[in-house]
Regions:
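N-terminal phosphate/diphosphate-binding loop that engages ATP/GTP or pyrophosphate donors
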Residues: 1-44, 50
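Short, surface-exposed, polar/charged, turn-prone segments marking secondary-structure boundaries
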Residues: 28-33, 46-49, 98-101, 128-132
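Phosphate-binding/switch loop-helix module in NTP-utilizing enzymes
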Residues: 37-82, 88-90
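Residue-level preference for the first positions of well-ordered beta-strands
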Residues: 1, 68-69, 99-101
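Low-complexity, flexible helical/coil segments
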Residues: 11, 36-42, 54-58, 104-111, ...
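Short, surface-exposed linear patches
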Residues: 23-27, 39-43, 74, 92-95, ...
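Conserved beta-strand scaffold positions in the cores of enzyme catalytic domains, especially
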Residues: 2, 71, 120-123
Length: 138
């Protein structure tokens, strides 16, 4: 359970992305390089406030169903500056009852670890995903 943010690309650069609920497949526009009415600008993207509200609802519904794994895509610079999913991550970082997989860019992993007091041994790189799978599989 949780969500991913599949992207669209234009001229080799990410130009837009949607928030997708992993349980239902439901999607909502999340970000775009083109200005959208009512959306909030952060760096080169405009973000849909409704997508953050919907994502929060999806996360809350996950906890009602006791998920085996909660996926958050992605934790990025916006969250490090207190926006985006930051408040949700504050809560999730204190929850040790649900296994969580946070997608984080390599260049900001250390900042994310510090901000949410995550131990180094909880970090898995794309190259070590087999170790992650073995950890959660019986």
């Amino acid at each position: 359970m949780g969500f991913l943010c599949p992207g669209s690309f234009s001229e080799g650069k990410r130009s837009a992305f949607t928030l997708m609920d992993l349980e239902t497949g439901s999607r909502i526009p999340m970000g775009d390089v083109n200005e959208q009415k009512g959306w909030v600008k952060f760096r080169r993207f405009f973000f849909n406030p409704e997508a953050f509200i919907q994502g929060e609802l999806w996360i809350q519904s996950c906890f009602k169903k006791d998920p085996g794994l909660l996926v958050i895509d992605e934790v990025g610079p916006m969250e490090l500056e207190g926006g985006g999913w930051a408040k949700t991550l504050d809560t999730l970082a204190q929850n040790s009852t649900v296994a969580q997989l946070w997608m984080v860019r390599q260049e900001i992993v250390q900042e994310v670890l510090r901000k949410w007091s995550i131990p180094e041994d909880q970090v898995y790189t794309a190259e070590s995903i087999d170790n992650l799978i073995q950890r959660w599989m019986p």
